[in-house]
């Protein structure tokens, strides 16, 4: 509701600590809060290699990015890129894609039947860890270069520009034409509310910003819903590549 003072309405909480993203909505019933805390426990605890005594969260690997959801979404907030070339990419990942080379692939992309053309060996997302005895697909390294920017009023600011490198490929050399897309883990707050926004409201907002000739504009993204097999409005992820929370979660587990 544009007139709502609180962005989250009755779900909002009045906590401003580092734990504020990790609290249940204030209007949850007691039973729903119980569901929240069970889910939150799974979110924080690491998955382990099967077989294991903790069979409710075994099955890690063989390749993976991190062992726990919380490792990427620290305190349910935004992640960060590695600070140095030696740092692990704990809350950061690399998406992969190849150029479309056939008429079928080009048509599938045009019709939103596929998000991208995945790499034939490494798939659509690089996994930089493996269980014991399984080589990781590669190591993600970053180098930062200072870049000076001068604003219109003469103010000078120094920004950092990253260069990402994929080293130690575990399953064959990378193709020269392979495209990479660095992604920082997104915050978890408000995703349930985002799922409740009607499609028409999102479309209307995109049209409104584009017609305003402003510096900020957007367009809605059509993607294939794997549950229905139909093209639907994307909502989740940096590029709105998932239609529902359940498919976003499934993608993160895959």
Regions found by a protein language model. Give the residues of each.
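Bacterial Sec-dependent N-terminal signal peptides
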Residues: 1-8
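Basic, ligand-binding patches in group-transfer machinery
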Residues: 39
């Amino acid at each position: 509701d544009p007139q709502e003072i609180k962005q989250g309405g009755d779900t909002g909480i009045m906590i401003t600590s580092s734990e504020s993203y990790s609290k249940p909505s204030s209007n949850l019933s007691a039973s729903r809060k119980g569901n929240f805390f069970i889910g939150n426990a799974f979110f924080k605890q690491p998955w382990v290699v099967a077989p294991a005594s903790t069979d409710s969260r075994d099955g890690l690997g063989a390749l993976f990015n991190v062992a726990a959801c919380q490792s990427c979404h620290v305190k349910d907030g935004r992640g960060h890129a590695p600070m140095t070339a030696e740092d692990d990419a704990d809350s950061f990942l690399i998406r992969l894609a190849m150029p479309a080379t056939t008429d079928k692939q080009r048509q599938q992309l045009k019709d939103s039947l596929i998000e991208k053309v995945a790499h034939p060996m490494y798939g659509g997302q690089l996994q930089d860890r493996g269980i014991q005895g399984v080589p990781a697909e590669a190591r993600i390294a970053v180098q930062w270069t200072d870049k000076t920017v001068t604003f219109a009023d003469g103010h000078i600011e120094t920004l950092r520009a990253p260069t990402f490198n994929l080293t130690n490929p575990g399953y064959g050399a990378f193709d020269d034409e392979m495209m990479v897309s660095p992604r920082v883990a997104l915050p978890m707050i408000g995703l349930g509310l985002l799922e409740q926004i009607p499609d028409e409201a999102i479309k209307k907002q995109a049209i409104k910003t584009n017609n305003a000739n402003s510096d900020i504009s957007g367009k809605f993204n059509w993607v294939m819903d794997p549950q229905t097999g139909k093209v639907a409005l994307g909502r989740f992820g940096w590029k709105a590549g998932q239609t529902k929370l359940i498919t976003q979660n499934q993608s993160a587990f895959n």
